[in-house]
Curated annotation (Swiss-Prot):
Its EC number is 1.14.99.56. GO terms for biological process: cellulose catabolic process. Optimum temperature is 65 degrees Celsius. It comes from Thermothelomyces thermophilus (strain ATCC 42464 / BCRC 31852 / DSM 1799) (Sporotrichum thermophile). The gene is LPMO9H. Optimum pH is 8.0. Cu(2+) binds at H20, H106, Y192. This is AA9 family lytic polysaccharide monooxygenase H. The lineage of its organism: Eukaryota, Fungi, Dikarya, Ascomycota, Pezizomycotina. Residues 306-342 form the CBM1 domain. Belongs to the polysaccharide monooxygenase AA9 family. Keywords: Carbohydrate metabolism, Cellulose degradation, Copper, Disulfide bond, Metal-binding, Monooxygenase, Oxidoreductase, Polysaccharide degradation, Secreted, Signal. Residues 263-308 are annotated as: Disordered. It catalyses: [(1->4)-beta-D-glucosyl]n+m + reduced acceptor + O2 = 4-dehydro-beta-D-glucosyl-[(1->4)-beta-D-glucosyl]n-1 + [(1->4)-beta-D-glucosyl]m + acceptor + H2O.
Length: 342
């Protein structure tokens, strides 16, 4: 499909389709960096140069377990490297902010990996990247909630720390939520990998070994094929073990942006951060960003009454919300607790 055709299709469904989400930006040391926006940037002939990887997830969709052995699981569907990077120091904390609000029903783990690029990340072959896990939070029995719940409570954001002893160099940060609301059934889990280019300064000499992205998970792993609806579940976060000295997560908080940065391109530089009067993030949840919504004319009459958007919940035990799906999708039963517009 050409981009022109895809743009027409995207605009036609813009008022109806609202899937799960993507990372909108990061905040590090008070500086806001814009990420790739698959819902708008993909359609632009000259999209902005950003730190995030380009991916063909215009519907804010996911990678299914049947594709975990393919390159799509590395940095999302048909992903290509971002055109620039952000500079951080070893030991820095990065606030990763999602949009739109992560669905309450989409419970599951939050996982972060790094991979050394051994050169410019902007031109790296994604199949050559070897990923090591720097955090991975699943179900917290003491708190009685999933990591995705903690992300929602933290202003729809996640705080991750770059290892303080990490060797300086260029790295890709792979941040991911795995939604388990349909994981009781084969091929029911939903992975949302997001990749961001970083240049890490300072640090030490630690460069952990890693695994290829296509080897991170299997569709039958205990943390992928899993019933999350049991009381106080015993859950194993999928993927390789955490690197030595890493914790499953750090204490979560949001970060206030006091300046706006731009992506640095190889051999050049991004603009110096400029002060901003609007906080990109603040204590839960008050991200303030200007957005523009375009609604295309309806070519067919929508169903009457409450209509659930594509990928939204449309049924399940105790469900009292919409049961009619937007045009182009139908209500599919994933298990007795959850039905989804697909």
């Amino acid at each position: 499909m050409s981009k022109a055709s895809a743009l027409l299709a995207g605009l036609t469904g813009a008022a109806l389709v609202a899937a799960h989400g993507h990372v909108s930006h990061i905040v590090v040391n008070g500086v806001y960096y814009r990420n790739y926006d698959p819902t708008t940037d993909w359609y632009q002939p000259n999209p902005p140069t950003v730190i995030g990887w380009t991916a063909a997830d215009q519907d804010n969709g996911f990678v299914e377990p049947n594709s975990f052995g393919t390159p799509d699981i590395i940095c999302h569907k048909s992903a290509t490297p971002g055109g620039g990077h952000a500079t951080v120091a070893a030991g820095d904390k990065i606030n990763i902010v999602w949009t739109p609000e992560w669905p309450e029903s989409h419970i599951g783990p939050v996982i972060d990996y790094l991979a050394a690029c051994n050169g410019d990340c902007e031109t790296v072959d994604k199949s050559s990247l070897r990923w090591f896990k720097i955090d991975g939070a699943g179900y917290d029995k003491a708190a009685g909630r999933w990591a995705a719940d903690a992300l929602r409570a933290n202003g729809n954001s996640w705080l991750v720390q770059i290892p303080s002893d990490l060797k300086a160099g260029n790295y890709v940060l792979r941040h991911e939520i795995i939604a388990l609301h349909g994981a009781q059934s084969p091929n029911g889990a939903q992975a949302y990998p997001q990749c961001i280019n970083l240049r890490v300064t300072g640090g030490g000499s630690n460069l952990p070994s890693g695994v290829a992205g296509t080897s991170l998970y299997k569709a039958t792993d205990p943390g992928i094929l899993f019933n999350p609806y049991v009381s106080s579940p015993d859950y194993t976060v999928p993927g390789p073990a955490l690197i030595a000295g890493a914790a499953s997560s750090i204490a979560q908080s949001t970060s206030v942006a006091t300046a706006t940065g731009t992506a640095t391109v190889p051999g050049g530089g991004g603009a110096n951060p400029t002060a901003t009067t609007t906080a990109a993030t603040s204590a839960a949840p008050s991200t303030t960003l200007r957005t523009t919504t375009t609604s295309a004319a309806q070519t067919t009459a929508p169903p009457s009454g409450d209509v659930q958007t594509k990928y939204g919940q449309c049924g399940g035990n105790g469900w009292t919300g919409p049961t009619v799906c937007a045009p182009g999708s139908s209500c599919s039963v994933l298990n007795e607790w959850y039905s989804q517009c697909l």
